[in-house]
Every structure is written in C-alpha cells, then in structure tokens.
Amino acid sequence: MKNKLLMTMAVIMFCVVAAFGQRTLTILHTNDTHSCVMPLSSVLADTLQAGRGGFLRRIAMLREERAADPDLLLFDSGDFSQGSSYYTLFKGDVEVGLMNQMGYAAGTIGNHEFDFGLENMARVFSHLNFPIVCSNYVFTEYNLQHIVKPYVILKHKGLKIGVFALSPKLAGLVDQRNYGNTQYVDPVATAQKMADLLHKEKCDLVICLSHLGWEEKGMGDQEMISHTRGIDLVLGGHSHTYFQTLRYVENLDGNPIPVDQNGKSGIFIGKLTLQLDKK
C-alpha cells in the first residue's frame, strides 16, 4: 500500500491469548483525521503529506481491504472534527456522513468533538451508525449519557472483544462553555475498572481507544498503561504521533502492551493482524 497516496501502516502481527482455538483478526485504525475531507495540498513542502489523505481515498482503500478480509474491524480514536471549512460550515454533518460509509466498529471522543458545544455534539453523535465510546467522561446534558457508551462488547469471529475508551482532561484544553457540566474522571482508575469489568464478561481481547496522547505531560498512554493491567491493545490518538511500528509500554505486571498511532489527517491508516492463541 506504500505506493498509494493514502498509505497504510505495514501489517504488524502479535499474539494475544484467547479462550478459543487460534483466530486471526485484522484491525484497522484511524485517529485525528481532523475533517480531512479532501487530500492535502500537493505543493506542501512536506512530501510525506503532500497530496495525501482525503475521505475518498480512505473509503476506496477500505473497500480493497474488506475485499481481502470481510471480517476486519475498523476503529477511530477521536478528533475526526475540526480542520477544514467543511466542519466550520456544516458542524460535523459531512464527517459523520462519510464515516458512516466506512463501517466503523466503534470510535471515541477527542477534544475537538466539543468545538461547537454539547448540543451539537449530541446531534452529530446521534447520526452515527456505530457506537461512540468514552469511559471517563460523565455526561448529564443533551441525552449524551445515553448516546455515549462507557464500553461495548463486540461478538466477532467467535470472539468477545471488549472495547472501552479514554479521553483527555477538558479543563485548560476545551472552552468550559463547550463542555458544560461534563465531568472528567481519572483515566487510570477508569481503565482498570473497565479492564476488570470486561474480563469478568469473559472477553477474549480488551482494546482501549485512547485520546490521551503519546508522551503527554501529566497523563498519556504511557502513564495509563504502566499503572494498569488487563489491557491487550491501545489504539491511540491526540498527540498526532506517527508510529512506523508498534510501540510497547510495560503494564503493572511487566507485560509489554502494544500501542498504535497514525499521525493526523488520515494520511496513514494503521493495520494490525492479531494472532489469538488458545489458552
């Protein structure tokens, strides 16, 4: 895929212990696409970005990937909003309409999803055809407490896949008028609570969609992972970091937990192939 204007990360394979016989699972992952509806300018000085990105290329690439593997799962780690006049003019309708064509299994909330306030966020999320998950925000307005899910369990290819999500502290990052009475809950405590719950639900794989960021001061993916156990994979975002290969962070038990992140603007889509082995 490297010869395409929309590039996909090299396939990365790693093993997770599952409750059944061996399964192969393909995961595709986007983050911080930031309303990149059209390709970036072809005259950008950065040749890695020039002419790349855009929803049509992403949709075409996904069509090819699904032709090869109809059972793949696609996730988004937030900040699909803000970054072009499409978002400014239509307040998320364009992005949501296009994402609905892509067949996401789940996505989470980035800080820019708040840019037009809670009422607009609730309106936009209610039009999505996939679940929006966030485990560490407590909503009390505009029915968001019912629209946003703390976790989802996907039954897929004979597996139970638990998905929860973490988003960043809002104070100092988002205008308070835009997040209203939304409460931020500690990501470490939330992550452990969710991992424990999903294991009690007999999930074979626990995935965290994270918009905490990589190497962020205070609370990022490294801090969260190193203080928790029971998470198998972190699909990251927020810091716009591009990983050519997976990064690993040791959890509380000293086990290396893989983390993926794919820059910004949808130039890259992460592709991971998991081999889930029998216990």
Task: Locate each region found by the language model.
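Bacterial Sec-dependent N-terminal signal peptides
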Residues: M1-T24
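Acidic, metal/ion-coordinating pockets
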Residues: G21-K279
